Amino acid sequence: MLRKKTDGFSLPLQKGPFQNNGATPWFCELNIGTPGQTLKFCFDTGSNFNWVTSSLCSDDGCQHYANGRFMFSESSTFEWIDQTGTTVDFGPWGSMEVEEGRDKLCMPIQKELDACLFISLYLSKKYSGIQFDELDWDGGIGLPSGEVSEVPLDKLSGTFRLAQSHEGEPTHSHFLLDLMDKGFVSKKRPFISFLSDMSEDKSARGTVSFGLLDDAYSTSLEYLFLPWARYREEVPYLWSSENASISVGDNLIGEDLYFTLDSGSSAFKGDKTVLKKVFEQTTETSPVVSISLTDSAGDEYGLLEITSDVYRRDIEEGQHKGQSVSQFQWLKGAEDMLLVGSVLMDHLYTVYEYEEPSDGQLVPKGVWIFNKPGGSKIIQTKQKEPASLFDKLKAK
């Protein structure tokens, strides 16, 4: 167990085959339970709960590509919280029947040294569907913006990955806040970042960092800051920014959208009317898709240009294997949403930033995105000064 306080740490990410289910192929191998059982977890900024495929599932149930499950009865540190059972919404994927428990999760943050937390999480006992079949990981760790919905449980949206208690409280404590409370991450460094190396797909590697920043981007002028804005009262935990529009070539397709970066997803998803049109216009031809971001005064502060080599992906396993598919998917009930995950994030350095914690709470500040040196020039806007994000490190 790591005892010395640290500024932060990084964890290696591995990439599974790209599948057409809308979920990221990236995962981190973590140990859960005592003795530790190694399973594949996604660090998911598009959900507000923790979960794992478990031995509650029948022998032929909970089929998924990663094919791991937590054998909770073999862990001496596992504790039940609630065995009455509940249903967790996975949006268009359907739902998952779960029970709730608590156990030790250990992360390899240094050679031969682990950081361990006791976390609450849902143990799945039933799920089904083609999307789950194609899932490259065994469970997820939610990294929400920190906002909590005040909408009654029975009024919550069925479009996004979310869970909430009947009292309107967060179902599970915030993972980053837990890391801070244990001294694994400095409270002066309230950020989470994702960076992947796609130079050789077969050996693709990535990194998720808590409290640490990549200094290679400290002098970059090719970046944007996307200030956080609440998409809907019932799903305030999403990392969204308002006033986005999307065009295909010179054709404006949708405006007044909430642009959301979701590390648990892969494809562009959202508003049915908008995303259906974008998909149709990018399937047979290869136009540039552009996303414009404007401030409250209507002035553009950011422009992204996404070429077909970014938005069209070769499907490596599962349904449509061997095909090249435009990664724009529409969701029922996701009006005014433009969400994207690894399809775009693989080409950017992405940092989720909070305000410094106060009274045991985390408040979202926004998301920083940077072009990779030598990579695709997705961000067309060039800034006059380097990102102020790095001032936190200089002030230390």
Which functions belong to the PLM regions below?
Residues 48, 57, 126, 146-148, ...:
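Conserved beta-strand elements of beta-rich interaction domains across eukaryotes
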Residues 1-21, 111-252, 366:
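Aspartyl protease catalytic domain
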Residues 20-136, 290, 295, 299:
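Signature of the N-terminal lobe/flap region of pepsin-like aspartyl proteases
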Residues 36, 111-114, 199-205, 296-301, ...:
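Short, solvent-exposed loop/turn segments that connect beta-strands within catalytic domains
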Residues 26-77, 105, 140-144, 158-161, ...:
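Aspartyl protease active-site motif detector
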Residues 292-396:
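Aspartic protease catalytic domain
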Residues 1-38, 86-99, 130, 216-255, ...:
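Pepsin-like aspartyl protease folds
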Residues 283-291:
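Loop/turn-rich, solvent-exposed surfaces of beta-rich toroidal or solenoidal domains
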